[in-house]
Amino acid sequence: MFVSLKLPTKAALSKLFLQCKALRGFFLKEANYNFQHSWLYFIFVLNQLAYMRGNFSVIALRELKWEVKRAFDRYRYFFKKHVYT
C-alpha cells in the first residue's frame, strides 16, 4: 500500500480554510453564549450595577432602566426556558 505524497490543490486548501473558518466562528459563538449565561456574566452585570449605583443620577437611572429592559428582551427565550420552568 502506497501513501500518496501529492500536495493539496489550491481548491482543496481554500475549501479547508473555509471549513476551519466556519468551525472557528461556531465555537466562538458557542463560547460567547455560554459565557453570557454563566455566573461570571451575572457577576459582571452586578459589578456594572454597583458602579452605576455609585454614580447615582437621573441619567444613570434611565440607563439602568434601558439596560434591564434590553437584557430581558435579549434573553427572553433563556428566561422562559430555564428560569420560569
From Swiss-Prot:
Keyword set, alphabetical order: Mitochondrion
Compartments in which it is found: Mitochondrion
GO cellular component: mitochondrion
Superkingdom as given in the UniProt entry: Eukaryota
Protein name as catalogued: Uncharacterized mitochondrial protein ORF15
